[in-house]
Swiss-Prot record:
Cellular location(s): Cytoplasm
Record protein name field: Regulatory protein ViaA
Family of the protein in this entry: Belongs to the ViaA family.
Function: Component of the RavA-ViaA chaperone complex, which may act on the membrane to optimize the function of some of the respiratory chains. ViaA stimulates the ATPase activity of RavA.
InterPro entries per record: Uncharacterised_CoxE (IPR008912), Uncharacterised_ViaA (IPR023481), VWF_A (IPR002035), vWFA_dom_sf (IPR036465)
Source organism superkingdom: Bacteria
Record keywords, A-Z: Chaperone, Cytoplasm
GO cellular component term, pick one: cytosol
Signal peptide: none
Lineage per the UniProt record: Bacteria, Pseudomonadati, Pseudomonadota, Gammaproteobacteria, Enterobacterales
Assembly with partners or alone: Homodimer. Interacts with RavA.
SUPFAM superfamilies (alphabetical): vWA-like
Pfam families hit by this protein: VWA_CoxE
């Protein structure tokens, strides 16, 4: 069967103009105009999607099939073009019958042309074919427009769904134009209103806890250098030149007080010969207050020292991915659970704004993984927020999963974030050693977000940074009072 793309080529019908006209009509629709006014950040994201829309429309036109009736009429037209005028006159009754049978829009006009002219001349033959071609072009154009209209309705429906989703999540997740673009890309999934309302709910909770949002931004955009802890830092040799007096005097450099008899000034020696001043001379000698010549030489020598190496490679805007481990034990339930989930949502916001990856791992007895910054990030975030914190605590498995993840090339500059109350068993020595190696050799940073003031110091000692957000009733009341 003939395709629409082939038909357009045969009849020299250009679909580019129709595609552009349809895109402009879509952008001028009231729904999009109102949406762009309300969410200006998403306008650039939608505009960047125009190329994909054009390609989708061209592909739809290219693959569309022409109706059998129109295909048969086009084939008859092509064959008629090859006939001479006498041959065409012989075939004319069959052509008129075919047009009538196919209910062609040109059937009535073709019959009128034939009946109104008793003699079928070559000029009439040319006119007949020209008008027939014009009728076919009109039919092809109408078919293109019908398909584009169907696609426009479908595209507008999809865009409206994505606009609704993006508009709901924009205040929570879109901090800048880059985040708005990634949010728009992620909105292409099949989501229902009830699904993403969970993100809206935790976004409202996060807005009610500004200290939690501020903590996430400080952690995500920390400008501190990646430093190696001093107790584990390797020693390096440093060589410096030191200036010091030589052992052999070279020249008179001035006068000083002292007890060097060989370098006494003549007036001091004169007092020794006066009986009344002799005791005064000895007193000043004992107290090293006699005036003497200062004879100095100079020398330079190389001084070799060893000291711990502290790396100060300042990473003003870290761009590595986040590996976030969330404790889902029973002690992290209730308000702790809400804060942990909202904090992860805040890190997702930072990751989208800075074009970073955000990888979530839940640890209790098993490790569950979610990628919040991928193409299906919204769906993954909904699944994560739907989890319940009712398991045990196996923080060692969490660290082993982090260590394993950091071995990959794409995670070489990742920052690890562990969210817990840190009320757990001590870490095995091999885990502590491996974490120290990652910090020392690869400058990976390990952050702790402590949800309790009673975390075990032995566990928290291995972290580069400890960010405290006490969820106790007293701390919650103090935070509310300070707002």
């Amino acid at each position: 069967m003939l395709t629409l793309d082939t038909l357009n080529t045969m009849l020299a019908v250009s679909e580019e103009g129709m595609v552009e006209e349809m895109i402009l009509a879509l952008l001028a629709s009231p729904q999009l105009v109102i949406f762009f006014e309300k969410f200006p950040r998403l306008k650039n994201a939608v505009t960047a999607d125009l190329t994909r829309w054009r390609e989708a429309l061209r592909s739809r036109l290219k693959d569309a099939r022409v109706p059998p009736e129109l295909t048969e009429e086009v084939m008859c037209y092509q064959q008629s073009q090859l006939l001479s005028t006498p041959q065409f006159i012989v075939q004319l009754p069959q052509i008129l019958a075919l047009l009538h049978r196919l209910h062609s829009p040109y059937a009535a006009q073709a019959k009128q042309l034939t009946e109104s002219n008793s003699t079928f001349t070559p000029a009439l033959h040319t006119l007949f074919l020209q008008r027939w071609r014009l009728s076919l072009v009109v039919q092809a154009t109408t078919l293109n427009q019908q398909l584009l209209e169907e696609e426009r309705e479908q595209l507008l429906s999809d865009v409206q769904e994505r606009m609704t989703l993006s508009g709901q999540l924009e205040p929570t997740l879109a901090e800048n134009d880059n985040a708005a673009g990634r949010l728009w890309d992620m909105s292409a999934g099949q989501l229902k209103r009830g699904d993403y309302q969970l993100i809206v709910k935790y976004g409202e909770f996060l807005a009610a806890q500004p200290e939690l949002m501020q903590l996430a931004e400080q952690l995500g955009r920390s400008r501190e250098a990646k430093s190696v802890p001093k107790k584990d830092a390797p020693m390096e040799t440093f060589r410096t030149l030191v200036r010091e007096p030589a052992t052999v005097p070279e020249q008179v450099d001035g006068i000083q007080q002292g007890d060097d008899i060989l370098r006494l000034l003549p007036p001091e020696l004169a007092t020794l010969g006066i009986t009344e001043l002799e005791y005064e001379f000895y007193r000043r000698l004992v107290e090293k207050q006699l005036l003497t010549y200062r004879l100095h030489g100079e020398a330079w020598r190389e001084k070799v020292t060893e000291r711990p190496v502290v790396h100060q490679d300042v990473d003003e805007q870290p761009r590595g991915p986040f590996i976030v481990c969330v404790d889902t034990s029973g002690s992290m339930g209730g308000f702790n659970e809400q804060c942990a989930k909202a904090f992860c949502l805040a890190l997702m916001r930072v990751a989208l704004a800075d074009n970073r990856r955000c990888f979530i791992m839940l640890f209790s007895t098993d490790v569950v993984r979610y990628e919040l910054s991928g193409p299906e990030g919204i769906e993954q975030a909904i699944r994560f927020l739907s989890q319940r914190f009712r398991g045990g605590t196996d923080i060692a498995s969490c660290f082993r999963a982090i260590i394993e993840r950091m071995q990959g090339r794409e995670w070489f500059d990742a920052d690890a974030v562990v969210i817990s109350d840190f009320i757990a068993q001590r870490l095995p020595d091999d885990v502590v050693s491996k974490v120290g190696e990652l910090q020392r050799l690869h400058q990976h940073r390990f952050h702790a977000v402590a949800m309790s003031a009673h975390g075990k110091p032995g566990i928290m000692r291995i972290f580069n940074h400890i960010w405290r957000f006490d969820t106790g009733m007293r701390s919650r009341l103090l935070r509310r009072w300070r707002r």
